[in-house]
Amino acid sequence: MPLCWLISVEGNHKPILLPHLQAVVLGRGPETTIKDKKCSREQVELQAECNKGYVKVKQLGLNPTSIDSLVVGKGSVSKMKPGQQLYIVNQLYPYTVQFKEDLSGSTKRSREAVSETRHNDKEEPCRKSSKQGEVSVSVSQKEAPKMSVRSNVHFSLLSILLSGLLSEGVGKMLQGSVGHWNLGLKASMQDPEMQVYKDDKVVVIKDKYPKARYHWLVLPWQSISSLKALRKEHCDLVKHMQQVAEQMIRQCPDASTPRFRSGYHAIPSMSHVHLHVISQDFDSPCLKNKKHWNSFTTDYFIESQAVIQMLETDGSISIKEGATELLKLPLRCHVCRKEFSNIPALKQHLNSHFPS
């Protein structure tokens, strides 16, 4: 059976083992390094279903825990799968889960060790199904006992390591998985073929799937997961990113290129903050659907200057509720606002504004 690991996207600590069917409680404290007082010491309860490849997430704290953009809700339980992100509280402190096949049988041994140390714990009450669409809870007569990360998980993991039961594959995963979420992006940042510009603070790369004739990403070398992770102390960095974006636009080799925009997606597709610098022709085979189009032509695309202003005045970035609904808006030309029923028709129309 696979082992399940909870991994801090921001790399704040080592991966945390989530034993099969054991309830693990996380929140503010040394295990997560979270110091935010809006995060309860018992903010979430996680229970891995290693044989099914998902983790049940129960919100215990008062402030919202969410999976991607979906709020779990206090007392409710939702499923989290690999590829999704768990935000412990208020869309902050992102985590992913990873399942790795256990070649040594260590899952069984670690589960038995945990059960033995906690066999006197009270049984949890049966869980109630949440009203949310993705929520699915399997109720059994006897729920697994809760365990503290500090004592049982760390003790169990230490026992596995000392007894030599941890497989080589999982051992390698432990060494490298803290940054697994952005390995592809990190590789692109370091790839001379992808780099267009770099300095000691940022690097500019070509977007792997450009949505226009010119589409670059400005990324800080510093690991920052998303807009919501930005704080006032990042203001100078974000200003520098915008300055580099303006430099890229000035140096564009195509003098006939239409105007550019530079900005951020409200909910980014990659877990490393990045500034899009994109020409407004949208002439690219990679622009294929309504989601692509609306992510750059509606308020889902937040102007770089607006982000700078929010940091200067508020010290943080606020994302409007229901931002994802903007991706479902009708297709409209961003120049004349004419509505279209499909992407091919819209692209054909764009030729009248931006001849090749």
From Swiss-Prot:
Residues 207-211, 269-270 are annotated as: Interaction with DNA substrate. Coiled coil: none annotated. It holds the Pfam family DcpS_C. A zinc finger (C2H2-type) spans 331-353. A motif (Histidine triad motif) lies at residues 272-276. PROSITE patterns: HIT_1, HIT_2, ZINC_FINGER_C2H2_1, ZINC_FINGER_C2H2_2. Residues 23-72 form the FHA-like domain. It catalyses: a 5'-end adenosine-5'-diphospho-5'-2'-deoxyribonucleoside-DNA + H2O = a 5'-end 5'-phospho-2'-deoxyribonucleoside-DNA + AMP + 2 H(+); a 5'-end adenosine-5'-diphospho-5'-ribonucleoside-2'-deoxyribonucleotide-DNA + H2O = a 5'-end 5'-phospho-ribonucleoside-2'-deoxyribonucleotide-DNA + AMP + 2 H(+); a 3'-end 2'-deoxyribonucleotide-3'-diphospho-5'-guanosine-DNA + H2O = a 3'-end 2'-deoxyribonucleotide 3'-phosphate-DNA + GMP + 2 H(+). It is an enzyme of class 3 (hydrolase). SMART domains: ZnF_C2H2. One of its GO terms (cellular component) is nucleolus. The record marks 188, 265, 276, 291 as: Interaction with DNA substrate. Its main location: nucleus. Its EC number is 3.6.1.71, 3.6.1.72. It is found in: Nucleus, Nucleoplasm; Nucleus, Nucleolus. Residues 104-127 have a biased composition (Basic and acidic residues). GO terms for biological process: single strand break repair. Residues 104-143 are annotated as: Disordered. SUPFAM superfamilies: HIT-like, SMAD/FHA domain. Keywords: DNA damage, DNA repair, DNA-binding, Hydrolase, Metal-binding, Nucleus, Zinc, Zinc-finger. GO terms for molecular function: DNA 5'-adenosine monophosphate hydrolase activity; DNA-3'-diphospho-5'-guanosine diphosphatase; double-stranded RNA binding; mismatched DNA binding; single-strand break-containing DNA binding; single-stranded DNA binding; zinc ion binding. The active site is at 274 (tele-amp-histidine intermediate). DNA-binding protein involved in single-strand DNA break repair, double-strand DNA break repair and base excision repair. Resolves abortive DNA ligation intermediates formed either at base excision sites, or when DNA ligases attempt to repair non-ligatable breaks induced by reactive oxygen species. Catalyzes the release of adenylate groups covalently linked to 5'-phosphate termini, resulting in the production of 5'-phosphate termini that can be efficiently rejoined. The histidine triad, also called HIT motif, forms part of the binding loop for the alpha-phosphate of purine mononucleotide. This is Aprataxin. The lineage of its organism: Eukaryota, Metazoa, Chordata, Craniata, Vertebrata.
